Each structure stands twice: as structure tokens, then as C-alpha cells.
């Protein structure tokens, strides 16, 4: 059985590595996903990243991915974010390396509960919660249901109701990544989507087909300081639609970036990370 290896273990060498492999506990890790065997699965798989000074105790950040994806897709966020924060990147049930727990029923509420279980496993009582696309919807439900565990909330291109892509492009992944995405990036995502975890994709799809966070009163229950980031030409929803749900979150603001992608956490990662870090810094200074 493959075991995830920490950055610290990788740096300290073989003796520590051997001790780690002898342990019965599978730990989160900071090394690339290829270090985890493709057939390795567990009920609550997550990756953990901390690239700052080892004597610091960083604040935790939970990164929630979207459908058809896994924790790997936060690759662009790790180098900058992990220098300031301890990153917890779960694979949602049925995706990546996470099994579907016995009796699990897909809904935003159950997915939010799953995130709490990952946090419990990681020893994290509360965290900054960040979600992209479907992960943004899960993040909003999490913040509403678990206010004491939510320090801040960042929603990066997440919908508040079922998706309806306007005038979809005939080119796979072009709507997702936008017209400026290089060919290599499009090819990578096409390869990623050619081998999806069907059970997880179907389950998340069902959960995302029957929800309305505004009508259900979820948005109004979010008390954490919230940043919503959207694109000015996203085919997932217009700026007006994003603003319509953002204003229902009591302590929130909207940032609009110039892009025709709807997966801006990937396509416009640097800009989204910059806004996120500035927001988190501002919230910290305000307390």
C-alpha cells in the first residue's frame, strides 16, 4: 500500500523515511501527486502543504476542488499560499484518492460534513475555507453550516445554483480555461477529464443539479468575512448573477477579474491568489 510522504521526511532522508513507511498512519503530504500510487485510496484522503519556516505555526487553509477534479488541481496555488499558510487539500468522495464512504448520499450538506471530517483528521478546528467552481458551492454551504470552523470564506467562480453554460464552445475545456489558455494547458485538462472517477462525478453532478443557496437561506447564514471572485465574461454566470448572490452574504465583497474562463482558479491562478492573500492579510490585520 502506498503511503503519502511529507516534505519534512523527504528532506531528512532515508532513516526518517523508513520510520514513516513503517507507521500505520497514512499522512498527508507535500510532494507531487505522482508520488501517490494511482490505485491508492482511503476514506478521507487529503494533501498537506507547508513550505514556510519549520518553527512557525501557520494558520490552516482548506482548498476544496470542483467536479471531475481532485486536490491536484490546486497545483498553481501551492507555491505561494503554502509559504504563508498550512494547506489542507482534500479529495472529495469518489474523486482522486478518496473512497465513497459507505452509505454516503451526495448533497452540499454531506460534502460540507465530509470536509469537517477531513479537518478533524488533520487536527484542524477552524480554517480559512477556499473553494473553486463546485468546490465554491460546497465551501458556501460549509461556512453556513459550520460558522465556528470558518475563519474566512473565499469563493472562486463558484455557483449558487445549478450551472447552465451559455453558448458552449465546441473545443473541449475552452470554456473552462478561456481563450488565453495555452495549448499545453488545454491538453492537460483534456487528459485529466478522459479518465474521470465516474462515481464521484455522477454524485457531485446530482448534488449540483438540485440546489439554490439563496432560496434555501444558505447565503444569508454565512457569517464569516467572504470574498467572491468572478470573471467578467464567464459562461457559467454573468457578473450581475454573481453579484446577485454575493450581496446576500452579509459580510462579503465581489472582485471581478478580466477573463472569459469560468475555472479562474486554474486559468487565472496568479490573479486569484493575489486577491486571496490580500484579503486574508486584511482580515488578520483587522482583528
Segments the model singles out, each with a brief description of its role:
Residues 2-3, 9-28:
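N-terminal export signals
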Residues 48-97:
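Conserved HGGG/HGGXW glycine-rich cap/lid loop of the alpha/beta-hydrolase fold
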Amino acid at each position: 500500500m502506498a503511503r503519502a510522504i511529507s516534505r519534512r521526511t523527504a528532506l531528512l532522508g532515508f532513516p526518517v523515511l523508513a520510520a514513516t513507511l513503517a507507521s500505520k498512519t497514512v499522512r498527508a503530504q507535500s510532494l507531487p501527486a505522482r508520488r501517490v500510487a494511482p490505485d491508492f485510496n482511503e476514506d478521507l484522503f487529503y494533501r498537506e502543504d507547508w513550505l514556510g519556516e519549520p518553527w512557525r505555526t501557520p494558520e490552516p487553509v482548506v482548498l476544496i476542488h470542483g467536479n471531475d477534479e481532485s486536490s491536484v488541481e490546486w497545483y498553481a496555488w501551492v507555491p505561494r499560499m503554502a509559504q504563508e499558510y498550512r494547506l489542507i487539500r482534500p479529495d472529495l468522495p469518489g474523486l482522486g484518492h478518496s473512497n465513497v464512504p459507505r452509505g454516503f448520499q451526495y448533497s452540499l450538506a454531506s460534502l460540507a460534513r465530509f470536509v469537517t471530517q477531513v479537518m478533524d483528521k488533520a487536527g484542524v478546528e477552524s480554517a480559512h475555507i477556499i473553494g473553486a467552481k463546485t468546490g465554491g458551492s460546497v465551501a458556501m454551504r460549509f461556512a453556513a453550516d459550520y460558522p465556528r470552523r470558518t475563519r474566512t470564506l473565499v469563493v472562486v467562480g463558484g455557483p449558487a445554483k445549478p450551472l447552465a453554460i451559455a453558448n458552449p464552445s465546441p473545443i473541449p475545456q475552452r470554456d473552462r480555461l478561456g481563450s488565453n489558455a495555452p495549448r499545453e494547458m488545454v491538453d492537460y485538462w483534456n487528459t485529466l477529464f478522459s479518465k474521470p472517477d465516474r462515481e464521484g462525478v455522477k454524485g457531485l453532478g446530482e448534488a449540483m443539479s438540485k440546489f439554490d443557496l439563496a432560496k434555501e437561506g444558505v447565503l444569508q447564514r454565512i457569517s464569516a468575512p467572504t470574498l467572491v471572485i468572478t470573471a467578467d465574461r464567464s459562461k457559467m454566470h454573468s457578473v450581475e448573477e454573481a453579484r446577485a448572490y454575493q450581496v446576500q452574504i452579509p459580510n462579503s465583497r465581489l472582485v471581478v477579474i478580466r477573463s472569459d474562463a469560468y475555472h479562474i482558479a486554474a486559468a487565472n491562478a496568479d490573479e486569484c491568489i493575489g486577491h486571496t492573500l490580500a484579503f486574508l492579510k486584511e482580515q488578520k490585520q483587522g482583528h
